[in-house]
């Protein structure tokens, strides 16, 4: 039986996948360190901050949505969400038209913490930002990473990318850059989707 040759060179495929793996690992090492340092004053870890981020964008996200868009196991999403609830940053709710699934929303305190983190973001402490400066100075913009975005889209799907792009749009709509810092826009000027009608769960 004749073996069908793949439409690519096997050695080329190995080199490409290893290049992606090793560069991604090196990049993540730097991202993880800077991300943790950013969160340290608030005593949050990366998973907790990611949950706050998704809850802010979706204005009522199910645990399965948190797991999917946060790229974490469902049990991880639930356990860290419970910890955030205990700290007063999240509340668990049910949708009036969906009693089966549990949804989470930011409390006022949780939203204040999330917004404070963004307002205190300092790009000079971010290695990826600093490492991209030569490209910015040469071309006048940061790398678009379109090819990487395409790869992620084919791995995680359109829903994942829609939330990713929506999160960037929301930050752009909700915040202004003033005097070298991010500032939350006033309610009149901010553009953000409202939450679906939810009812609280009694603990």
Curated annotation (Swiss-Prot):
Keywords of this entry: DNA-binding, Repressor, Sporulation, Transcription, Transcription regulation
GO terms assigned for molecular function: DNA binding; DNA-binding transcription factor activity
GO biological process: one example: response to stress
DNA-binding region of this protein: 63-86
Coiled coil: none
Record's keyword annotation contains Acyltransferase: no
Entries under InterPro entries matching the protein: HTH_MarR-typ (IPR000835), HTH_tscrpt_reg_Hpr (IPR023488), MarR/SlyA-like (IPR039422), Tscrpt_reg_MarR-type_CS (IPR023187), WH-like_DNA-bd_sf (IPR036388), WH_DNA-bd_sf (IPR036390)
Transcription regulation among keywords: yes
Domain HTH marR-type, first and last residues per copy: 13-157
Bias type Basic and acidic residues, positions: 178-195
Chain residue ranges for the region called Disordered: 178-203
Described function: Negative regulator of protease production and sporulation.
Protein name as catalogued: HTH-type transcriptional regulator Hpr
The species this protein was found in: Bacillus velezensis (strain DSM 23117 / BGSC 10A6 / LMG 26770 / FZB42) (Bacillus amyloliquefaciens subsp. plantarum)
Originating gene: hpr
């Amino acid at each position: 039986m004749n073996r069908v040759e793949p439409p690519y060179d096997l050695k080329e495929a190995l080199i490409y996948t290893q290049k992606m793996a090793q560069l991604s690992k090196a990049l993540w090492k730097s991202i993880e360190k800077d991300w943790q340092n950013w969160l340290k004053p608030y005593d949050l870890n990366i998973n907790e901050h990611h949950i706050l981020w998704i809850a802010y964008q979706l204005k009522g996200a199910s645990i399965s949505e948190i797991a999917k868009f946060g790229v974490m196991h469902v049990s991880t999403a639930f356990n860290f969400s419970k910890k955030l609830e205990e700290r007063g940053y999240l509340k668990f709710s049910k949708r009036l038209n969906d009693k089966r699934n549990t949804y989470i929303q930011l409390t006022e305190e949780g939203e204040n913490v999330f917004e404070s983190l963004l307002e205190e973001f300092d790009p000079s402490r971010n290695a990826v930002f600093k490492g991209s400066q030569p490209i910015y100075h040469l071309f006048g913009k940061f790398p678009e990473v379109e090819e990487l975005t395409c790869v992620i889209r084919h791995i995680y799907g359109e829903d994942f990318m829609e939330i990713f792009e929506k999160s960037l749009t929301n930050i752009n709509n909700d915040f202004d850059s003033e005097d070298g810092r991010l500032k939350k826009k006033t309610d009149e000027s901010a553009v953000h989707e409202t939450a679906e009608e939810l009812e609280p769960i009694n603990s």
